[in-house]
Amino acid sequence: MQGVYPAIITPLKENKVDYDGLRNNIDFLIENGVSGVIPVGTTGESPTLTPLEHEKVVEKVVEFVDGRVEVIAGTGSNSTSEALEFSQYAEDVGVDGVLLITPYYNKPTQEGLKRHFGEIANSINVPIVLYNVPSRTALNIEPETIKYLFNEYSNISAVKEANPNLSQVSEVLDSCDIDILSGNDELTLPIISLGGKGVVSVIANIAPKEFVQMVDFANAGKFDKAKEIHYKLFPLMKLMFVETNPIPIKTAMNMLGMPSGELRLPLCEMAESNKLKLQNALNNLGLLK
């Protein structure tokens, strides 16, 4: 895996999934050069989608993409059997891979993680991207565990690494050849400089062309050019997490007239003070017309 993989939002209209809007957003991203799309992850509000909505969104994304780029579906859960079942469903409807978050809340041991991911890997054939996000799960996939999983299971091929500690990335890449994608827009360039391949991006939902250019420059070793884009987008990157994701990105997309819609509780609208900051950042980048 290499390049920019937007973690796409799930657009809503009157509290129902807006599939026409979803198609439009996907076409926009593909036209601007992304390597793939990642539906029903954190940014896609997966915790508040019903199981049927979750499945239908994945099915529709595969249909709308129609083989033009990769589809890596979020299929993780803190229940191994549930994650396995949804991963099998996603494979059946034609995804190119699955993204499996570390089980949250029940906080398994590293041995439990090995068994959790291993059981799923043995049950599907498509590539698996491990998703390490300790800030949400209160659990880190230790480098030794990642090394074990990569060496033991041929379809565990990548990690979305959202641990801000770059020592983690260094330790992983020093021990095995697994592909690492940054799980944090702000850390994309540092992670690529250490040997990472790209990013699962939030900001790419609204600035895909620029982010693809930045990552392409970085992967080609042209870091001076990549840094120019990084610093141009950096204020907006920070604002994407001024409140809980996906509140800022959905707010920005609404401001830009893109299909986005409301959020589902317990997420709610952005504070007015933060909306103003976001509006100013979009204006400064020339994104607001």
From Swiss-Prot:
One of its GO terms (biological process) is diaminopimelate biosynthetic process. Keywords: Amino-acid biosynthesis, Cytoplasm, Diaminopimelate biosynthesis, Lyase, Lysine biosynthesis, Schiff base. The keyword Amino-acid biosynthesis applies. One of its GO terms (cellular component) is cytoplasm. It catalyses: L-aspartate 4-semialdehyde + pyruvate = (2S,4S)-4-hydroxy-2,3,4,5-tetrahydrodipicolinate + H2O + H(+). One of its GO terms (molecular function) is 2-dehydro-3-deoxy-phosphogluconate aldolase activity. The record marks T42, Y105 as: Part of a proton relay during catalysis. Pathway: Amino-acid biosynthesis; L-lysine biosynthesis via DAP pathway; (S)-tetrahydrodipicolinate from L-aspartate: step 3/4. Pyruvate binds at T43, V200. PROSITE patterns: DHDPS_1, DHDPS_2. It is found in: Cytoplasm. Its main location: cytoplasm. InterPro entries: Aldolase_TIM, DapA, DapA-like, Schiff_base-form_aldolases_AS, Schiff_base-form_aldolases_CS. Its EC number is 4.3.3.7. The active site is at Y131 (proton donor/acceptor), K160 (schiff-base intermediate with substrate). Pfam families: DHDPS. PANTHER family: 4-HYDROXY-2-OXOGLUTARATE ALDOLASE, MITOCHONDRIAL (PTHR12128:SF66), DIHYDRODIPICOLINATE SYNTHASE (PTHR12128). Belongs to the DapA family. Catalyzes the condensation of (S)-aspartate-beta-semialdehyde [(S)-ASA] and pyruvate to 4-hydroxy-tetrahydrodipicolinate (HTPA). Homotetramer; dimer of dimers. This is 4-hydroxy-tetrahydrodipicolinate synthase.
